[in-house]
Amino acid sequence: MPLSVRLRRLGYRIAFRLLQALWFVRRPRKSGVKCLITSGGRILLVRHTYGARAWDLPGGAMRRGEPPLQAARREMQEELGLGAAAWRAAGELRGSDNFRHDVIHCFRAELVEPTVRPDPVELAMTQWFAPGALPSDLAHYVRPVLDQALPATGGI
């Protein structure tokens, strides 16, 4: 792995720790997106290079004034190199994480071709999983998003 990627990953980890300290003090309300991406009956999960590094759904924070669908499209382009996909709203979740009060807008997209180009700075790994063979170390929002998204869209 190139030194520039390793240094940028380190920067992400340091920035995340600093944000956690700020969130501990301020307890902000944040809006974000999580995207359930499926292909051939499998679910795409990612491991970020920062934070808990558990298997997670791709997604991220919404920018101020950014509509949820636009945020989902932007995050998928940034993290996975995914361009145009038919996105469907799949519900909304509320909860607390890392001292924040989160509103998570859930979206779903089915890819015909399961090719993604992960950003090596932000993502340590990407992997496709069968719904019955999900890893045990899932980020805490994954199961609620799956529960919310799958019934709303007729399953995988």
Predicted regions and their residues:
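Acidic, metal-coordinating catalytic segment for phosphate/diphosphate chemistry
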Residues: 1-34
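Conserved Nudix-box catalytic region and its N-terminal flanking loop in Nudix hydrolases
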Residues: 33, 38-78
